[in-house]
């Protein structure tokens, strides 16, 4: 199977699975989601709010796309298969949540928002992008490192994505289930493309 078909299969498969989960979430989890948002809002602090407003930009595509491009350029096309995979993962991390949002059509939380957004909510686009792109960059850049350092770099990428997810809930623009789905979707997309689709680009040994 070619790289393109594997990417397409991963994209459609994850979109369908996430959409099905999204319909279940809409039907079953609203009370829990609202309870968590209200609990978070009740303990907001001005300093933490300022941090959340900054941290949340780490999941913004206008920030992440140049970072991904810079990684590719700095590597000087050293490993073309890795670089192509990074570009595809970055693009897909924006396109996947967009498609699922259209299908599930879950409105944003209507209370406790610190940033007022009117777009759809499930899954969190910022979280999906952060999960997919930071993990892929970490995998690509840590290939030549020892096991301990490699695990540290990948762990840092995971932490960044989780912090972005937290910021979206803290700011009241996403339900907790939106960001949980975003994390799982982003990581799944990155791992499928990198470890299943990318090897088909490698020269035959």
Please place each PLM-identified region on the residue numbering:
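N-terminal transmembrane-helix/juxtamembrane module of multi-pass inner/ER membrane proteins
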Residues: 1-63, 102-114
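Interfacial segments of alpha-helical transmembrane regions
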Residues: 4-13, 68-94
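Hydrophobic alpha-helical transmembrane segments
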Residues: 8-12, 56-75, 83-88, 133-134, 141, 151-158, ...
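Aromatic-anchored segments of alpha-helical transmembrane domains
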Residues: 19-20, 91-99, 159-169
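Membrane-helix interface segments
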Residues: 47-48, 78-83, 110, 147-152
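Membrane-embedded catalytic cores of phosphoryl/pyrophosphoryl-handling enzymes
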Residues: 68, 112-205
């Amino acid at each position: 199977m070619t790289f393109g078909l594997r990417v397409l299969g991963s994209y459609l498969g994850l979109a369908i699975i996430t959409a099905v989960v999204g319909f279940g979430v809409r039907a079953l989890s609203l009370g829990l989601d609202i309870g968590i948002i209200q609990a978070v809002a009740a303990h907001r602090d001005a300093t933490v709010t300022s941090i959340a407003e900054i941290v949340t930009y780490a999941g913004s595509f206008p920030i992440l796309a140049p970072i991904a491009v810079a990684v590719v350029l700095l590597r000087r096309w050293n490993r073309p298969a890795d670089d192509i995979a990074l570009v595809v993962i970055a693009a897909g991390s924006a396109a996947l949540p967009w498609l699922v949002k259209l299908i599930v059509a879950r409105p944003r939380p209507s209370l406790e928002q610190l940033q007022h957004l009117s777009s759809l909510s499930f899954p969190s686009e910022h979280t999906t992008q952060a999960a997919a792109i930071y993990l892929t960059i970490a995998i690509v850049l840590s290939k030549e490192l020892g096991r301990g350092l490699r695990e540290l770099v990948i762990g840092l990428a995971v932490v960044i994505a989780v912090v972005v997810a937290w910021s979206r809930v803290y700011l009241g623009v996403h339900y907790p289930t939106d960001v949980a789905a975003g994390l799982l979707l982003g990581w799944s997309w990155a791992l499928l493309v990198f470890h299943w689709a990318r090897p088909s680009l490698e020269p035959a040994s």
